[in-house]
Amino acid sequence: MTVSDDTRALDGFEALAALIWTVPFFRSLERVSCARLIGALEEVTVPAGTVLALEGGDADALYLIETGEVSVTVRTPEGERVLGTLRGPAYFGEMGLLLGRRTASVHAASDIRAWRLSRERFEQIVRQQPSIAMAVATTLAELLDQRARQYAGAPVVARESQPLRFEPPPAARPRIWRMLGFALTIGVPAVLWGLSPPSRLNLEGWHVLLVVLGAAIGWLLEPVPDFVIALAVPAAWGIAGLVTPAAALAGFSTPAWFMALGALGLAAAMLRSGLLLRIALRLLRVFPSTHFGQMLALLASGVVITPLLPLGLARVAAIAPLTQELAESLGYPPRSRARAGLLFAGLVGHTAFSPVFLTGLVMNFFVLDLLPSAERAHFGWVTWLASAVPAGVIILVGAILTLRFGLHPEVAPRTGAETRRRQEYVLGPISRDEQVTLAAIGILMAGLVFQPVLHVDLTWPAVVALIVLIVAGTLNRQDFRASIDWGFLALFGVLLGTGGVMRQVGIDRWIAGFLAPLAQAAGSPELLLVILAVLVVVGRLVLPWIPATLLLSVALVPVGPQIGLSAWTVGFVVLAAANTWLHPRQSDVYRLAREMTKGEMSTDAQGFLVGAAMTVATLLGIAACTPYWRALGLLGR
């Protein structure tokens, strides 16, 4: 592309952005939301005489006219009446998106070049971008207010609106299901409470274990949110007189809890500032515009972003809409192999490598906190990565092979590079909030990487990074309250304390005794690790991802040294194996991606194919790493 071509392209991008902001619904959109909106637009050229909308018909799209002229008419008892003409830059169809029907007919008076936003994509974007929904509501309220004032003869007051953030409420479960969940969550431990404890477990430990069993049933059936069940665990222990409040709630004062708090604040800043979107768009431009090239770009995006954003669901929430916009721009039909390949490249890329980086997942900090003190001091950010990278490479190779040969495209793509360039243009130069977020990331990563030299606990870089974000104004008081998942932190803190309680009452020794025959039957630590990985995969068939990971970590990590394994290898196996799925409904991240793309990107059969293949790749990665871990002294202790 020549300099003049670049100039013309930039002028075109500026014109399109200006055209979007002429629509009342979109005037208050920030640049990040506007960039996401551009990805959903479809460029169309229409010859003169074409009927674009018919009065009374279904409203299928909003049109942004870049060049050309259209005539707007309505039917009257006297015949068709011309209301006027629209000459580009202009728009029409915005009310039809809300009403579902056309209020006038529109004919192309000349050849026109326009951008089309389908009603289906508009509704989808509203779900993905709450700020757009609030902008629509604000615009309608202002129109009603202005008309009421005009009718009453009062002066019209101009208002500046600020888009607010809100999340749609989760779908409610049937009442009978919730009642059954409550009954089993409370009833099963109550029925077993009076029984004698198993061999080698004291009565206090048995009762502590029954409360955890009730929590596991609650997490499976979900009569209430998972963090409510977690909070009920220390409450039940305290009411039963099993542990003191200080012991039950000790997890909220651990370094891992504050590391998680800092990491979640950093995740919120990356999402709000647009830094995550900018990184993904830049990588999509670097790789070839072929289907395989874009899949590699999405995988690479995950490898780059995962250590920077330790929240898998947030990464998927950001990348899933981008994969759909990419599929639309490349012209792939719904639920085709080509579309599924893009979705799963983004999904696998932004989740499969979470256990490889210490900062890849908040739950990694949980495992770190469960390690014996000497082992915890050994595993900094670099040591964790060095120990896990061979498994990560095998998982990456498995992902590439699965996507390349299992989800190859049925048709050749059309170019979609121009859409990415338009989105990057609207994002503009890197903003101050992005710069502050990058500085906070730098503080965190420098503290983690150089921790062995600085001799500073891993907690403090995360806390300092969060302070920088708040002091600089990138996260304000409202953002701190609304953008951090406090429910997850409640669950996280309770389960951090659960490990100490289980050690206090001897449950860890009882589990070690239970696993000892399995270790002897395995005959080698290598085989034992693979067996544990398979058992975790089986456990995930029953329990949801987050509770399963945390609960299995609490149960298995502390007993690793007692059965000839380092606690870290057991923790890594739990993190990696629990991160897989066989049936798509097992995976929180897959269900989130399907919801955000309205099920248009893939089928459950394709999800099963990818899930099964990645489960095999993960198990192979664990098995292949065992000689490496033995060489590092992590096996055969």
Give the predicted meaning of each segment.
Residues A15-L16, S33-R36, R102-T103, E120-E160:
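A small-molecule sensor/coupling module
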Residues T2-A48:
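Cyclic nucleotide-binding regulatory module and flanking cytosolic helices
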Residues F227-P333, I484-I563, G636:
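Membrane-embedded alpha-helical segments and adjacent helix-loop junctions characteristic
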